[in-house]
Amino acid sequence: MYKRQGLINDPYLDESYRIDEGLRIARQLLIEINRQGLPAGSEFLDVISPQYIGDLISWGAIGARTTESQVHRELASGLSAPIGFKNGTDGNIKIATDAIQAAARGHHFLSVHKNGQVAIVQTQGNPDCHVILRGGKVPNYDEPSVNAACQDLTAAKLPPTLMIDCSHANSSKQHERQLVVTQEIAAQMSKGSRQIFGVMVESHIEGGAQKFTPGKDDVNALKYAQSITDACIGWADSEKVLETLSKAVEARRKK
């Protein structure tokens, strides 16, 4: 399984790293998605590419390994979209609450301007950041974990609401367990919990994942619409997840 950095970094999957072309392809893809009336979300891995695609992103995520990164917190402070910070890989939520507080403030730092020139950037702060529970040494999507996380948010004088990542450590990296996770989340919501406002699910058209090594494996031999990174649930299971969550939202509205 190829741990690639994404479409922008190596768009042709051949180690040519045509980042310039990757930016164009990614931007065109996002334009087409937006034209369909669909909001697009993205994880922000670096602090430069958002200048080229940020206007087409409605929601962004900062990963567990970069939530502590000062430059990513500065980036989040200037993005015109809600940003989710994941808890640490050990399950520590404090690094995420610290990140939210840091991103809510204005910052000054070196970055690039929309024309690609180096510039001194001043941000106003982003009041729309939140925590994403992705599990740690143990899963943290269950009701006691959600309650504990919301208590920590309240103690940090932040809104006690959050998003849950159904994959990664919450699914023990078993993609099909995402259905079990969403059922538990739906049960909490159906009882009236308003602490959970969203979920992340690793989903694709075809379930599972396929092995791929750039420079070794043939790109043309890849199976269409199946992940080459993390294993995902397929289209049919994705529909089940959406239906389960939809019913939970309806039940919550009646409480």
Model region roles, listed by residue range:
Residues 43-47, 88-90, 134-138, 167-171, ...:
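Active-site beta-loop-alpha junctions enriched in small/polar residues
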Residues 10-26, 31, 57-83, 105-114:
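Acidic, His- and aromatic-enriched active-site or binding-groove loops in soluble protein domains
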